[in-house]
Amino acid sequence: AMLRDRWPGKLMLKGPISPSDARHAVSLGVDGLQLSNHGGRQLDRAIAPVDLIAPVREAVGPEVSLVVDSGVRHGSDIAVALALGADACSIGRAYLYGLLAGGELGIDKAIDILTDQFQRTLHLLGMRAAAELRAHGRELLVAP
């Protein structure tokens, strides 16, 4: 709450690990949540961020921004995250691999690959846009 009192801008919290953590953060004035397992480095047995999306979205409602930043390796991972209730995904490894392989052009290529994979996933689901996925995608997901 002290940080919220000192910062007038948007405030995002990274790393809530339960819906109750998320609710508490929102009650303290947080505008958005970044669901992360910190690359699996700090606590390798923590719940996967993808498994938190739906329960956290249900806990905090549609007004709070949800960004997923772990486990995004393929465009279909982005589709699943959006279908479960995320507003966006952050990527780390994909663009770093692109950078290492081809510099700036490699980054562009990595983003193009993710975009193509995401679009293909939408089309295979019979959808044209992310908005359709957000509205109807959850019913298409099958539990692993």
Predicted stretch roles:
Residues 1-68, 75-97, 130:
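Alpha/beta enzyme core
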Residues 45-58, 99-119:
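C-terminal helical cap(s) of enzyme catalytic domains, especially alpha/beta-barrels
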Residues 70-71, 126:
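Alpha-helical hinge/cap motifs
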Residues 116-144:
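Charged C-terminal helix
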